[in-house]
């Protein structure tokens, strides 16, 4: 591959220091909160509160391990690190070479900038520590030390993964109007999980009625929104004079109590320091004889950087879909762990997988995904495919952070989650042939009686628009050996080979590689109908669902000879899957070169679309496409937010190739989209990509952060195009692309950190 590097000449002493110091992947380990609000307290004040028995008074992101990881970002002048030196001390004035009383790593020759572990035995619980780092570039010259960061170790180490405290952002309702009933009506603009605070002036004792809801009917809160769309009301007594009143949100009997719940899983409870929350956008108040002078909503959410990402394009629907899905990741972070919506508030692997990828693409935040993944290792849910998805979650964590701590901590559980114990003589796995055992289920972290294949959800129900089959599984014919389950099994084995390799477990890596090859061969032998050119639902089935072909395509199982026919079948089924299934459908379409078809699904205005959610007044993604297809759907489900990651990973084409983004791809798949630009967060810094797509040329601007190299693909309008880099002609004769692609050719080159203008014309 051709490689281009930007060469910068620097004066001696011009190097800047590293930035963005993270401890356990958390950048802000200093801010102390109380009840979700930042305070002026410092880390030592937290220790004092602990000593006084007031551990619930102050919150901070504590380090819950004696061997925390350190990460940083390189200054722009250092395109690639050749060495680092870390200092850790018990006081900031000791952060000097020769004085650091906890640890001095010495000069370490290493390109790694994330996941550097402190040796064991050096830290104590309930103690404040300070650290800094300097790095050397390829010339061996070191930068100055970075401004120090500090962290507080937990009072008792559990060996878990650290996360940030939940925060509250107080919003004031605007506009506020009076409706035909004489009630005050307030619109906060977007739905959020929050509480309510009112400033009220009353002439005497009075009682206000407060209505909260996600949906409106004109300028009133919709009291009967249907499905599981939220509506509630409260009676609020007030006393004479002016005062501020805060509603105490009632706990829900289903999502706010620890008890066995349906399939042996439990809801996540809100911590006492923030209190119970309710999802709503609108507030309507029957004021009686009192005057309400201010309506505020404290919104509860996880740490969030709105400016970490952006996307805009020439298509207004696509822009609206992106904004919907990005905001959904923020709004649904209220529990500090990924949950499946307000109805249950339970972590599920499938929800977490889409939430994880989408969160990575909209914010440089990694700890809520890591915490959720680790939580699920011992809180597995019932679907077979969800059990297998844990391996995908764990690999994504390593791929996006470069920190292998989760892989090490959960390796044995991940091995069990490949479900190799269910392998039959034909090389495939089955949950229906008597191989499930209590021991296997416990090793998978599942405490129910058995796991069951799901394919998609709901499996049956109302007839779909534009498809013949009921439910969201496209009429899937479930049997003993199912194509979707074994496609997931293959993907889990494939990734476990990589995980074992990272952890230097060579025998395991060889085993998983061999099993993956066997499963791929078995699926293509038993499930691929070579006459029809697509996959049947399982052994003995005569049904050919969308899912049976889209998962093998998304997971790279389809033989080259059958790619075109499999893609034809996938295209023919439209959006015959749920909002969850759309993640893998769009992955398959983009990876197969069907970028125009994928763009059409993303920008569809039909009932099975994200636009349908927007058009019906929602600002957070739904659990399903429409109540017609899932009658009990809710309006606060992040598993409906796949476009947040699809637009970045596939349409803009920005993905990590090597762990910690040491190498990435930038491969736009524009279809007929005229223009787009995006800022993509990574642990190394922002990637910026913009393109202009015309019949005669494809213009592209990219900015690549330090610490990585990018394999860049530039679509070309014709086979006779030439590539220009920063104004100079670089190459002619582009490579032919997949016959399904909107562009007949493309150029590939490797770029080092810097900013580039690329033009294929």
What is each PLM-predicted segment?
Residues 17-335, 351, 365-368, 405:
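Extracellular/oxidizing-compartment recognition motifs
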Residues 213, 403, 725-727:
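Short strand-turn-strand beta-turns centered on an Asx-Gly dipeptide
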Residues 288, 354-363, 390-406, 488-506, ...:
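Well-ordered alpha-helical scaffold segments within catalytic/enzyme domains
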Residues 390, 429, 447-461, 471, ...:
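C-terminal capping/lid segments that line or modulate ligand- or cofactor-binding pockets
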Residues 214-219, 268, 291-294, 299-304, ...:
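Acidic, mature catalytic/reactive cores of soluble proteins
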Residues 292-367, 371, 381, 385-388, ...:
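Active-site acid/base region of carbohydrate-active enzymes
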Residues 1-16:
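Fungal secretory targeting signals
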Residues 25, 513-514, 518-521, 596-761:
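Non-catalytic C-terminal accessory modules of carbohydrate-active enzymes
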């Amino acid at each position: 591959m051709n490689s281009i590097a930007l060469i910068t000449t620097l004066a001696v002493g011009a190097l800047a220091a590293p930035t963005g110091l993270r401890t356990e992947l958390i950048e802000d380990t200093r801010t102390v909160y109380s009840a979700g609000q930042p305070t002026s307290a410092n880390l030592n004040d937290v220790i004092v509160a602990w000593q006084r028995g007031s551990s619930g008074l102050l919150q901070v992101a504590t380090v819950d391990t004696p061997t925390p990881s350190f990460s940083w970002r390189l200054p722009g002048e250092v395109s690639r690190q050749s060495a680092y030196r870390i200092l850790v001390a018990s006081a900031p004035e000791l952060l000097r070479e020769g004085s650091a009383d906890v640890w001095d790593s010495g000069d370490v020759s290493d390109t790694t900038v994330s996941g550097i572990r402190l040796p064991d035995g050096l830290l104590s619980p309930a103690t404040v520590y300070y650290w800094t780092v300097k790095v050397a570039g390829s010339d061996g010259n070191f930068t100055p030390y970075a401004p120090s960061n500090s962290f507080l170790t937990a009072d008792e180490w559990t060996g878990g993964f650290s996360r940030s405290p939940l925060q509250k952002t107080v919003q004031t309702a605007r506009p506020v109007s009076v409706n035909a009933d004489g009630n005050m009506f307030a619109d906060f603009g977007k739905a959020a999980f929050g509480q309510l605070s009112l400033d009220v002036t009353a002439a005497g004792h009075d009682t206000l009625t407060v209505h909260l809801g996600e949906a409106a009917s004109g300028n009133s809160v919709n009291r009967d929104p249907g499905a599981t769309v939220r509506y509630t009301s409260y009676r609020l007594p007030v006393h004479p004079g002016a005062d501020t009143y805060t509603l105490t949100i009632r706990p829900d009997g289903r999502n706010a109590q620890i008890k066995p719940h349906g399939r042996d899983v439990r809801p996540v409870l809100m911590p006492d320091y923030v209190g119970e929350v309710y999802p709503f956008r609108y507030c309507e108040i029957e004021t009686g004889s009192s005057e309400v002078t201010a309506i505020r909503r404290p919104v509860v959410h996880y740490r969030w950087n709105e400016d970490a990402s952006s996307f805009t394009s020439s298509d207004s629907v696509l822009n609206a879909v992106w904004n919907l899905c990005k905001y959904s990741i923020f709004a649904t972070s209220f529990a500090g762990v990924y949950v499946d919506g307000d109805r249950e508030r339970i972590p599920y692997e499938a929800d977490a997988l889409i939430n994880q990828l989408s969160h990575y693409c909209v914010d440089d935040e990694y700890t809520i995904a890591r915490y959720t993944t680790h939580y699920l290792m011992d809180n597995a849910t019932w679907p077979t495919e969800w059990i297998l998805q844990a391996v995908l979650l764990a690999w994504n964590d390593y791929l996006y952070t470069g920190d292998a701590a989760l892989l090490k901590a959960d390796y044995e559980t991940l091995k069990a989650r490949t479900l190799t114990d269910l392998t039959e003589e034909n090389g495939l796995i089955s949950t229906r042939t008597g191989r499930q055992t209590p021991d296997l289920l416990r090793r998978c972290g599942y405490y129910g009686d058995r796991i069951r294949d799901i394919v998609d959800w709901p499996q049956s129900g109302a007839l779909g628009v534009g498809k013949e089959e009921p439910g969201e599984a496209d009429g899937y014919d479930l049997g003993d050996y199912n194509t979707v389950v074994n496609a997931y099994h293959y993907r889990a084995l494939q990734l476990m080979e990589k995980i074992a390799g990272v952890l230097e477990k060579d025998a395991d890596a060889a085993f998983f590689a061999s099993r993956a090859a066997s499963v791929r061969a078995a699926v293509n032998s038993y499930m691929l109908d070579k006459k029809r050119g697509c996959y049947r639902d399982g052994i003995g089935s005569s049904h050919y669902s969308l899912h049976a072909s889209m998962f093998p395509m998304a997971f790279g199982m389809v033989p080259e000879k059958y790619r075109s026919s499999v893609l034809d079948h996938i295209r023919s089924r439209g959006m015959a899957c749920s909002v969850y299934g759309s993640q893998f459908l769009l992955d398959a379409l983009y990876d197969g070169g069907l970028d125009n078809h994928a763009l059409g699904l993303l920008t569809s205005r039909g009932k099975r679309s994200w636009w349908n959610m927007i058009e019906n007044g929602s600002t957070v993604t739904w659990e399903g496409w429409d109540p017609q297809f899932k009658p009990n759907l809710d309006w606060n489900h992040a598993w409906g937010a796949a476009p947040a990651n699809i637009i970045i990973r596939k349409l803009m084409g920005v993905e990590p190739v090597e762990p910690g983004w040491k190498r990435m791809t930038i491969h736009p798949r524009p279809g007929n989209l005229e223009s787009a630009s995006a800022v993509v967060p990574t642990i190394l810094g922002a990637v910026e990509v913009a393109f202009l797509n015309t019949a005669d040329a494809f213009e592209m601007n990219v900015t690549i952060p330090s610490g990585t190299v990018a394999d860049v693909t530039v679509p070309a309008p014709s086979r006779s195009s030439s590539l220009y880099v920063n104004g100079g002609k670089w190459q002619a004769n582009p490579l032919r692309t997949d016959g399904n692609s909107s562009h007949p050719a493309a150029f590939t080159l490797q770029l080092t950190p810097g900013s580039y203008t690329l033009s294929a014309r």
